């Protein structure tokens, strides 16, 4: 690439200075300031883009035009441009006749969206035989401009070198290489060659001059070496020709100015029929890419490489589209970054879909606005790349939003289920339906809102996952509610069978188990009906109902066995046996308590009551109803995870084993023997009472002592005092406390006396002999018998 060269706005009469040190003329405004884009050392300036922005054309898009002038040195090219477009190019000092324009300069037309290039003249004495720059500048001008103004004098028409026909031949060859195939496929690439014939005096009509130039151009075209596939192409397929004549600038100054203004109108008036800037001539390079495009062309020209303008346009398009895409993407990333943290934090962002659509639309709109002017293929590819990057940035936000919606809706569903299942009267199916519809509706609305237009994203798959989790949660809730319902039914069943079981076990009878099992079956049937009634709203399957009923039956049986085991524990069953024995031994058939007399047959009554009571032990030992239809058959298996098999189901009717029965029998026998001994003692006490005659003997023998007390004043006074004291103590209720105090004092006196005697005689403390109650009772029974 050519070395940088800054803006050069030097005056005509100042010596030439390299562009790097030339300041902008203070007499030029920013909109008409000129810039040397290529200096005489063939270096391209890096400041063209900045100058285009100063001209106010950077954002013009395609609403601009480029025109270049081509011709011999000192033919008034700069003057013509200044008159036509209001530019500020340096013009020649006619008194010195030296080169004015060096390199290529550019200036914006006054009040026009036109960038005008003033190209160094050909055939100048300064360059002499060096035609390299002439060819390169002609090639550069043709590749860059829409209209190439060929400036020549009238007397040069018909000449070959004087009319620059040799250079035009080079231009034609270059143009054929540049636009041959492109024009053949029907796309743009045409250029207008505007021949401005200067110093026209009118003797030779313009039409004749036009015919001469046209013939010369066609002859040159025919002499070109064309590729085989382009040999039939005509000059008119690539170039449009236009001709105009201007009178002498000095000899006919007024007419010259009027003709120039008329020619200017053809550049300005778009409504004019002979308007020169036709759309077909435009190179379709956006204004903001002109500097980069021209620099690329000049670099190719400088290195003598084959100049492929379509490739240059694509390279420019790639460069500019990448720049535009980067700017749009930077702002887009800043916008997306603001919502990244909330989404990653698990929060559902309200209106995220609208924001993402807005961000994406803004980025694409910004890209389309600035990049759509460039090469369509490159623009389309870069747009697709931009869309892919935008979507890859938004996709995590979209998926995160769906994930957060999923969690939120699942939490809402659980809450709705728990709230709906409170209370007594609820329909599980309705609660589940309302909660599910609400959660799915919320997720669907959020998923639709989060969807970005123009993408192939979908939220239906996530909705299916949510539905699966909702079903799993609902199944767990249904299982929990079913378990709660079974537990409640079980508690009610226990409550209803508790009292009847206690009642029937307390009054043992041969049909005791029939009554207990009948009550149990009735209660269990009611419990099963209650379950089936409530289970309808749970949408339970037949298998689930069967399993639940089996579990309920097993739980009911376990509850019954637990109650029976409670009522047949050792202390309780022995109490029942004692009560049964007492009712038959201590009471007669009418329920009157018996008072045993020596002549009563205690032994027979005892044996009868004992045998009847012992007959109850086998009755209590096994649940065995007389009516076999009342026997309860447990389910073979149960899926109830809340019950444990604490006993063997095959032996569950057995309450007492044979060993247990023998143990209970022995314990009861000992209790019964105690009752028998007690009865025998009561008869012995009645036999050993004091005879009545003893009381008469006591009166006779104690009469004198009684008289002594009664007739002795002292003794009688003490007797009265003792009687009065006893009466007062009895009236005040102090008899018991007095006896208690007396016993306490006596015990304390006895303890201290015993301790003193032990200390005195050093006698050891002897333990009381162990007395065995039952054996002693048996000895006493033997003695009595």
Swiss-Prot record:
Q: Which residues form the signal peptide?
A: none
Which residues lie toward the Cytoplasmic compartment?
1-689, 735-785
Identify the EC number(s).
Answer: 3.6.5.-
Query: Transmembrane region positions?
Result: 690-710, 714-734
Q: Where is there biased composition of kind Low complexity?
A: 22-31
Task: Name the protein family.
Answer: Belongs to the TRAFAC class dynamin-like GTPase superfamily. GB1/RHD3 GTPase family. RHD3 subfamily.
Q: What's the protein name?
A: Protein SEY1
